Swiss-Prot record:
Keyword annotations from UniProtKB, A to Z: Ribonucleoprotein, Ribosomal protein, RNA-binding, rRNA-binding
UniProt record, GO biological process: translation
Family according to the record: Belongs to the universal ribosomal protein uS11 family.
Gene Ontology annotations for the cellular component aspect, listed alphabetically: ribonucleoprotein complex; ribosome
GO molecular function: rRNA binding; structural constituent of ribosome
Annotated spans, Disordered: 1-21
Gene3D superfamilies registered for this protein in UniProt: Ribosomal protein S11
Xref: SUPFAM superfamilies: Translational machinery components
Name recorded for this polypeptide: Small ribosomal subunit protein uS11
NCBIfam families registered for this protein in UniProt: PRK05309.1, uS11_bact
Subunit text: Part of the 30S ribosomal subunit. Interacts with proteins S7 and S18. Binds to IF-3.
Keyword rRNA-binding: yes
């Protein structure tokens, strides 16, 4: 029986994108960093989970720092130099992720908090009793 031929998908080509937008979504359980070009095409992304952290460790500031460094490294390989940062969510990794992007060698031009705030929308979850 003949072996099925392997189909190779579209190869990711190296683009030269000097500026872009970083979206940091920081929840209590995880931090996701996506870096896109000005048109909105995602160039690189990383999360605390994809950086090797599991369980409760994904919500830590160190995990957010590691994820931001990984995403920044891939974006710099594509030619990224300047970033606008959009931060969303209440998590503990917000500031750490921004600092990690800066220390990776990216110049941050703008930081904007885009956390959605309800005008008395859904009922919040019940208080934890430990």
């Amino acid at each position: 029986m003949a072996r099925p031929t392997k189909k190779s998908g579209p190869r990711k080509q190296k683009r030269n994108v000097p500026s872009g937008v970083a979206h940091i979504q920081s929840t209590f359980n995880n931090t996701i960093v996506s870096i896109a070009d000005p048109a909105g095409e995602v160039i690189s992304w990383a999360s605390a989970g994809s950086s090797g952290f599991k369980g409760a460790k994904k919500g830590t500031p160190f995990a957010a720092q590691t994820a931001a460094e990984a995403a920044a490294r891939r974006a710099i390989d594509q030619g990224m130099r300047q970033l606008e940062v959009m931060v969303s969510g209440p998590g503990s990794g917000r500031e750490t992720a921004i600092r990690a992007l800066q220390s990776a060698g990216l110049e941050i031009t703008l930081i904007r908090d885009v956390t959605p705030i309800p005008h008395n929308g859904c009922r919040p979850p019940k208080r934890r009793r430990v």
